[in-house]
């Protein structure tokens, strides 16, 4: 049964069908092979509905909507200008500012695609003008945007939390340390790159310009305060924090900044609705697929066949990293989380691994795979936005992928990088 389901998925993917079709088809085939007919079909429908029933999923369209509003408004530019005012003048400062701006906007929006658009669109031309190569600029924007997978809010963490039953609030807090560690790695590389290539520095901003930039960015900086402060302080659940972010974004862009008009609402709602529909369909069919393979005890059979259960906690973590990394090079990250998390669930439980640490590692691997050739989804986002050839986009990615893999190794060796803030906040 496993072979037929996997072959069906691969075959339909190669034929160019959207990911939801192979998942749904494989689920139906597996269901028929287990139950032998339509008699229990209502069970499959129930599993489809169960996938999108959790109230926590409401946070997904909320964060998507907030990100769309901010991308179309002034929040992103104000954050970029503030970062540039303080570190733009150092060696490699423009590149470091790009990485920091991606991280900061990721902490505001939770969306890698929104971050690529909001930060990459204004900063890539400035980087090219300053003397950075296009391949380096594109790779930096893509990989820095993927830090949004780790810095809360993170849609990937929400999906993992629902599938695994892990606290989304704990995942959000635990992602901060690894996200900042990766930002530091990228910043060091940017400085070294600028020194080696002889990239000139930007003019230094005066303290008056810095204070002005901070003043203008104070309102957008309220987003991470609402999310992290609200969850940490027990004021909001993650879902309530998402709703508060939407309200805050509407007030900022429509009332305070007046950067958007009533006529923009239709385009924003349409964009949010389309993205949300795709995510929810994937979650629904992914849940039915996960239920079928779990019911058939396929995960246990796979893990026993490859001997992962005897590998110990470190071996299980390495296997998880490799599986998620490779899968995300070819398949949408949400689908990978939905399909592979149940596969490794028995091994995670058997070895007593902290599900929060596992969630952070999975999220990191999703980030790496999404920016890795041949089919990482963020590569094609950059191709669509910047209108550059495929080879130009991927040429500068290897150093960043190496740093992300190094970050994963450090997390396995030193789990407190992720768990320290979690323990401080919740234990």
From Swiss-Prot:
- Gene Ontology MF: a single term: transmembrane transporter activity
One Gene Ontology CC term in the entry = plasma membrane
Q: Which InterPro entries match?
A: DctM, TRAP_DctM
Q: Does the keyword Cell membrane apply?
A: yes
Its membrane topology: Multi-pass membrane protein
Give the chief site where it resides.
membrane
Q: Does the keyword 4Fe-4S apply?
A: no
Report which superkingdom the organism of origin falls in: Bacteria
Q: Which UniProt keywords apply?
A: Cell inner membrane, Cell membrane, Membrane, Transmembrane, Transmembrane helix, Transport
Write down the Pfam families for this protein, in alphabetical order: DctM
Tell me the compartments it is located in: Cell inner membrane
The record's note on what follows loss of this gene reads: Deletion abolishes accumulation of ectoine from the medium.
Q: Which residues cross the membrane?
A: 13-35, 49-69, 79-99, 103-123, 147-167, 172-192, 216-236, 237-257, 273-293, 320-340, 356-376, 400-420
Function statement: Part of the tripartite ATP-independent periplasmic (TRAP) transport system TeaABC involved in the uptake of ectoine and hydroxyectoine in response to osmotic upshock. Probably functions as a recovery system for synthesized ectoine that leaks out of the cell.
Please give the subunit comment from the record.
Answer: The complex comprises the extracytoplasmic solute receptor protein TeaA, and the two transmembrane proteins TeaB and TeaC.
Q: Which family does the UniProt entry place this protein in?
A: Belongs to the TRAP transporter large permease family.
Query: Under which name does UniProt file this protein?
Result: Ectoine TRAP transporter large permease protein TeaC
**Organism of this sequence:** Halomonas elongata (strain ATCC 33173 / DSM 2581 / NBRC 15536 / NCIMB 2198 / 1H9)
Q: Name the gene.
A: teaC
């Amino acid at each position: 049964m496993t072979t037929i389901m996997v072959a069906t998925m691969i075959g339909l993917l190669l034929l160019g069908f959207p990911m939801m079709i192979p998942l749904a088809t494989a689920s139906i085939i597996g269901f028929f092979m287990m139950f032998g007919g339509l008699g229990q079909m209502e069970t499959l429908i129930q599993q489809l509905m169960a996938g999108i029933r959790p109230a926590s999923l409401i946070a997904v369209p909320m964060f998507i909507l907030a990100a769309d509003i901010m991308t179309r408004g002034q929040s992103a530019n104000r954050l970029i200008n503030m970062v540039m005012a303080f570190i733009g003048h150092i060696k490699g400062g423009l590149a470091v500012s790009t990485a920091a701006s991606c991280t900061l906007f990721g902490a505001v929006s939770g969306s890698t695609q929104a971050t690529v658009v909001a930060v990459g669109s204004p900063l890539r031309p400035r980087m090219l003008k300053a003397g950075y190569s296009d391949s380096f600029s594109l790779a930096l924007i893509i990989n820095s945007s993927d830090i949004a997978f780790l810095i809360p809010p993170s849609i990937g963490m929400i999906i993992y939390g629902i599938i695994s039953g892990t606290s989304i609030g704990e995942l959000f807090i635990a992602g901060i340390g690894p996200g900042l560690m990766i930002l530091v790695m990228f910043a060091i590389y940017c400085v070294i790159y600028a020194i080696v290539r002889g990239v000139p520095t930007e003019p230094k901003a005066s303290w008056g310009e810095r204070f002005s930039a901070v003043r203008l960015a104070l309102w957008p900086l309220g987003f991470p305060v609402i999310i992290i402060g609200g969850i940490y302080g027990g004021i909001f659940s993650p879902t309530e924090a998402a709703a508060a972010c939407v309200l805050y974004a509407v007030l900022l862009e429509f009332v305070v900044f007046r950067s958007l008009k009533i006529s923009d609402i239709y385009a924003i709602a349409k964009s949010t609705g389309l993205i949300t529909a795709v995510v929810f369909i994937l979650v629904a069919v992914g849940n039915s697929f996960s239920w079928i393979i779990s019911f058939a005890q396929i995960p246990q059979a796979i893990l026993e066949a490859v001997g992962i259960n005897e590998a110990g906690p470190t071996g299980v973590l390495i296997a998880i990293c490799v599986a998620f990394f490779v899968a995300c090079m070819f398949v949408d990250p949400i689908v990978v989380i939905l399909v592979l998390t149940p596969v490794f669930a028995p091994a995670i439980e058997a070895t007593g691994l902290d599900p929060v640490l596992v969630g952070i590692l999975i999220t990191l691997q999703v980030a790496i795979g999404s920016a890795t050739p041949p089919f990482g989804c963020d590569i094609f986002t950059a191709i669509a936005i910047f209108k550059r050839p495929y080879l130009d986009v991927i040429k500068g990615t290897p150093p960043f992928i190496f740093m992300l893999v190094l970050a994963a190794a450090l997390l396995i060796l030193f789990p407190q990088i992720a768990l320290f803030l979690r323990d401080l906040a919740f234990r």
